[in-house]
Structures are given as structure tokens and as C-alpha cells.
């Protein structure tokens, strides 16, 4: 085992604080509408330019092991905030730095670190409750756009596109962000349920120009197993022909004679029909077939339930206003399922989302909710160069996460003002002893740090701005760093999601509390320069004559 270096007491804490400061100073320059960019070197390709706090934090690795430990702990703050709220990583980093700085000063002055931490925790609980009380619901699409705009560093176009996408697919809908090949940023919306399976034969195509199959007012047969013969289905097919409605068959596979029979019937014009494979694999396939059944108001023909194709009747089939099939995708629009049943299915899947521990499963379950509840929107981010596209994509991702958070827990005044106003609720809060009271005052002072940083990044004195806002009794009064004006932040459109502000503070206080209570640090001792791995070879002098 390698030898270890151990640092204690003030030496350990000072090293750790240096690492915290290096990382936080690099991240906090990005905060606010006039925050600067950070350029990240990449081992291949062009450097990456970003204003995303967590992207900057993740790149930082320090040479000194003890400083690096401090930096990594603050990196954890940014990562956790990003995972929970999707935005607010820079705010969380600034808060963590402010709490750690003041906390370590108090420890150096002889205060008990554990009591300081208890005071910090007491204050955090109180402020989080105040933020939740101050939050109000997002009232309209314009406010969604404002949240997106603020998070995208003031780019109104991004905020508007996210608001439009959310309006079309609903708050539960899936919105994905991709890179566009062109210069423009575009939004495509797929309403209804879409899955990645196309037609099994090009002979099913009804629109030869677009190479798509379009079925209006269509009935849907859902079968769990493979179809290799249509013989058992003949009575059903005769009823379908009489109904004069197109039929879509979704099964594990349709092959051989069954597929040939369908194609021949389609070409002769006797039957308007198409067949696609069921989406997914294994248990997920069964679940998705059940989703489609609920969406279309039909039943899955499953041998597990004792159903046979021979006994299928028309009332077991689902239906939809429109179904469009390309060679790769099938979209079911306006299924005939009961609204109450669809809502019950969505609630059931949500329960599974809460219980699952796998990120992959959670993502797939969320997709299923979106397909049942709303639809899918894709925002394709464009730009002049690859570097610009990547930088804008970061901002769109942040803005999208912020708008989702706003819809979940409501909005508060932006620009760091919500934290300062919530801090006023700490007046009169006392701990069990003086050291805990100091912990409370550390949080109160730290709550001003994001506001000060936003002001300083805009070239204004942060202390003056913080003082003016502290003195005001109007909870909406704040400083708009974009225009350098004071006034009603809601009227300016400067708003933040309550969830982002709350999460940033909770994560910052949690990690900062751990750093303050650190008394010793252990790290690998660096290897001595020049020593060969095996202790070096003995001198080989005098052997020059060997052949």
C-alpha cells in the first residue's frame, strides 16, 4: 500500500479552502445575464466555450491532492444540483463557497464546528420553507418563456421555443434537445404516440411521394406473438372488410405466409391494411403494447390470458383518428381510449418511476408517460460553428430544465433576490448556544453572495446592490443586471424556478457543513521524481564490450 500524507487542523482546512476557491472562482464568473464565458480545453477537437457552471466544475482537477479534495467536494454540489433541478449549479457553487469561507473563519476563531453546522442546518430549513411559501404557480406560457430566457442567459428566442414546445406537448411531454445541421434553431412536435417501428413491407405505402402509410379512422389489432398464418384471423378480416375501415396490425412479427397474404390483399384493393412490429423487447414490449391498447381503447390479444385469434371480435380492437407510418416510425394520433383509463395508466407508470433505481429504466418510463400524456417535441439547436452549437445546446438544456422545475414547484423573483428576501425570515431565529447563532448568521450573510456576484459580473458594486435590496420591504424589488435598473422583478420578467433556488441552497449547505467539520485529511503521498518503479537498476558500467 502506498504511503499516505495526513494533514490536520488549520493546515488541512486552509488547503481545502484553497481548492474550493479555485473551483468556485472559475465557475462564478458565468453567473447572471452579464456573466462571462469559460473556455475548456479538449483532448481532441476545438476547445469548448460554455457558461454552464457544472460543465466548468467537471473539468477542474487540481495537482495538489488536498486542494483537489476541496474542489471535488464543491464539484459534488454542482453535480447534485444539476441532477435534482437541472439548473442553478453556479448559484449552488457560489453559496457553498460563501458558507465554507465564513464557516472556516469561525472555526479558526475557536468556535465548535459541530454547533456551527447545526446552526447552518437550522437556518437552511427556515429559508427553504420561506422560498416554498414565496413561490407562486406559473400562470401562463409567457412566464414559462421568461424562466427559459433567464436560464438561457437572456436569449429570448430560446425561452420562447421552449414555451411553445411545452404548450404543444403539455407539461408531462418529452422535450429533447439535439444539434441541428443548419444555422437555425427549430422545434418539431410529434403529437400522439410515436414508436420506432416502421412498416414491414413497402407495399403497405399509401403516399408514394413521401413513402408513408397514412390510415384515417383506423382500427388496431394488437397481438403479443408472431403471426405466421392468417387462417385463424379470416372471420375477423371479413368483418374488417365489411366495416370499410383500414386495419393496422401490431404484433411481435408478421412473417411468411401471413405477410404475403396481407400484401396481396392490399394490392388487390380488397383490404386497406398495414403491419408493424411491436416496440421494445421482452417485458417492456408487453408493457408498451398495453399502453397502446389503453390509448386506442382496445385489448392485447394474449395467449397468457387465454385469448385466441379465432375468437377475436371487432369490439376487442382499438381505434385511432389517424395513424402515420414511415419506414422507421409509427405515430398514432388521437386514440379512442377512455381518458380516465389513460390517466390511471400514467399514474401507475409514475409510481414505477419513483420506485426504480435504474436511470435507464427511469428514462424509458418517462418516455412512456410522455407518449400517453402529451407528445414529443424535439428542439434542434443551430449555429455558425460547432463550438457555437455546443455552447447554445448547453444553454437550451439549462433553460429546459429550469422551465420544468418552474412548472413543478412554481416561481420566485430572480436575480438572487429570492434568497435575500427569504433570509429576512432568519431574524429572531436562535440556536441552543452562541456557536449555533453564528452558524445561522453565516447562512444569512451567504444568501447575499449570488446577488452580489450577479451585480459584480455586470460591473456594479455588489455591496451597494445588496444593501438597497435588504432595506426594501417590497418582496418583488430587485436589481435587473441586464438593464442595470431597480424595480419589480416580476414586471422585468426576471424570475427563477423555486425548485432551482431551493435545491441550490440545500446542496450547498449540506456539503459546506461537511467541509467545515473536517479535522483531518488523508491522501496518497506523491511519488518521488526520477525513481524507477523497481528501485532502479544497478550501474551497468564496464559492460560496453558485450556483444
Swiss-Prot record:
Q: What class of enzyme is it?
A: isomerase
State whether keyword Nucleotide-binding applies: yes
Instruction: Spell out the subcellular localization from the entry.
Output: Cytoplasm
Keyword terms of this UniProt record? ATP-binding, Chaperone, Cytoplasm, Isomerase, Nucleotide-binding
- InterPro entries, A to Z: Chaperonin_Cpn60_CS, Cpn60/GroEL, Cpn60/GroEL/TCP-1, GroEL-like_apical_dom_sf, GROEL-like_equatorial_sf, TCP-1-like_intermed_sf
Q: Which domain of life is it from?
A: Bacteria
Q: Where is this region: Disordered?
A: 527-547
SUPFAM superfamilies for the chain? GroEL apical domain-like, GroEL equatorial domain-like, GroEL-intermediate domain like
UniProt keyword annotation of Secreted present: no
Comp. bias intervals (Gly residues)? 532-547
Q: Which CDD domains match?
A: GroEL (cd03344)
Principal location: cytoplasm
Listed under catalytic activity are:
ATP + H2O + a folded polypeptide = ADP + phosphate + an unfolded polypeptide
Q: Which PANTHER family match?
A: 60 KDA HEAT SHOCK PROTEIN, MITOCHONDRIAL
Q: Quaternary form?
A: Forms a cylinder of 14 subunits composed of two heptameric rings stacked back-to-back. Interacts with the co-chaperonin GroES.
Protein task: Together with its co-chaperonin GroES, plays an essential role in assisting protein folding. The GroEL-GroES system forms a nano-cage that allows encapsulation of the non-native substrate proteins and provides a physical environment optimized to promote and accelerate protein folding.
Tell me what this protein is called: Chaperonin GroEL 2
Per the UniProt record, the source organism is Roseobacter denitrificans (strain ATCC 33942 / OCh 114) (Erythrobacter sp. (strain OCh 114))
The gene from which this protein is expressed is: groEL2
Amino acid at each position: 500500500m502506498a504511503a499516505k500524507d495526513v494533514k490536520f487542523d488549520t493546515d488541512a482546512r486552509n488547503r481545502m479552502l484553497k481548492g474550493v476557491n479555485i473551483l468556485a472562482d472559475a465557475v462564478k464568473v458565468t453567473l447572471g445575464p452579464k456573466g462571462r464565458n469559460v473556455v475548456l480545453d479538449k483532448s481532441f477537437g476545438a476547445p469548448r466555450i460554455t457558461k454552464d457552471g457544472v460543465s466548468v466544475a467537471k473539468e477542474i482537477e487540481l495537482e495538489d491532492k488536498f486542494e483537489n479534495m476541496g474542489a471535488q467536494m464543491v464539484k459534488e454540489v454542482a453535480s447534485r444540483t444539476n441532477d435534482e433541478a437541472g439548473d442553478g449549479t453556479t448559484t449552488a457553487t457560489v453559496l457553498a463557497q460563501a458558507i465554507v469561507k465564513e464557516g472556516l473563519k469561525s472555526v479558526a476563531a475557536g468556535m465548535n464546528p459541530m454547533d456551527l453546522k447545526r446552526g447552518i442546518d437550522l437556518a437552511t430549513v427556515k429559508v427553504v420553507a420561506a422560498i416554498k411559501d414565496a413561490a407562486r404557480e406559473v400562470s401562463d406560457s409567457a412566464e414559462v418563456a421568461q424562466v427559459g430566457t433567464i436560464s438561457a442567459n437572456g436569449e429570448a428566442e430560446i425561452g420562447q421555443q421552449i414555451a411553445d414546445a411545452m404548450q404543444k406537448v403539455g407539461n408531462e411531454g418529452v422535450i429533447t434537445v439535439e444539434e441541428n445541421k443548419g444555422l437555425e434553431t427549430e422545434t418539431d412536435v410529434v403529437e400522439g404516440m410515436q414508436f420506432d417501428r416502421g412498416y414491414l413491407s413497402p407495399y403497405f405505402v399509401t403516399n408514394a411521394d413521401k413513402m408513408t402509410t397514412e390510415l384515417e379512422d383506423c382500427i388496431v389489432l394488437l397481438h403479443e406473438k408472431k403471426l405466421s398464418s392468417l387462417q385463424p384471423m379470416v372471420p375477423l378480416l371479413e368483418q374488417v372488410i365489411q366495416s370499410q375501415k383500414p386495419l393496422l396490425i401490431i404484433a411481435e412479427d408478421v412473417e411468411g405466409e401471413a405477410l404475403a397474404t396481407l400484401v396481396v390483399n392490399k394490392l388487390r384493393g380488397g383490404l386497406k391494411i398495414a403491419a408493424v412490429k411491436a416496440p421494445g423487447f421482452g417485458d417492456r414490449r408487453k408493457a408498451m403494447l398495453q399502453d397502446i391498447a389503453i390509448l386506442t381503447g382496445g385489448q392485447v390479444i394474449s395467449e397468457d390470458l387465454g385469448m385466441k385469434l379465432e375468437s377475436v371480435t371487432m369490439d376487442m380492437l382499438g381505434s385511432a383518428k389517424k395513424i402515420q407510418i414511415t419506414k422507421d416510425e409509427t405515430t398514432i394520433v388521437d386514440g379512442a381510449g377512455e381518458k380516465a383509463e389513460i390517466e390511471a395508466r400514467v399514474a401507475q407508470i409514475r409510481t414505477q418511476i419513483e420506485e426504480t433505481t435504474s436511470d435507464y429504466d427511469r428514462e424509458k418510463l418517462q418516455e412512456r408517460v410522455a407518449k400517453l400524456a402529451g407528445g414529443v417535441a424535439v428542439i434542434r439547436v443551430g449555429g455558425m460553428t460547432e463550438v457555437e452549437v455546443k455552447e447554445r445546446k448547453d444553454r437550451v438544456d439549462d433553460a429546459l430544465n429550469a422551465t420544468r422545475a418552474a412548472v413543478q414547484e412554481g416561481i420566485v423573483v430572480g436575480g438572487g433576490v429570492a434568497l435575500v428576501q427569504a433570509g429576512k425570515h432568519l431574524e429572531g431565529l436562535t440556536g441552543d448556544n452562541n456557536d449555533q447563532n453564528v452558524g445561522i448568521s453565516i447562512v444569512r450573510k451567504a444568501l447575499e453572495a449570488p446577488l452580489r456576484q450577479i451585480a459584480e459580473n455586470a460591473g456594479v458594486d455588489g455591496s451597494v446592490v445588496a444593501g438597497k435590496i435588504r432595506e426594501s420591504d417590497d418582496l418583488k424589488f430587485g436589481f435587473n443586471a441586464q438593464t442595470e435598473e431597480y424595480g419589480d422583478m416580476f414586471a422585468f420578467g426576471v424570475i427563477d424556478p423555486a425548485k432551482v433556488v431551493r435545491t441550490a441552497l440545500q446542496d450547498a449547505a449540506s456539503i459546506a457543513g461537511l467541509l467545515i467539520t473536517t479535522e483531518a485529511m488523508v491522501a496518497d503521498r506523491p511519488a518521488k521524481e526520477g525513481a524507477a518503479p523497481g528501485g532502479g537498476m544497478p550501474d551497468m558500467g564496464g559492460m560496453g564490450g558485450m556483444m
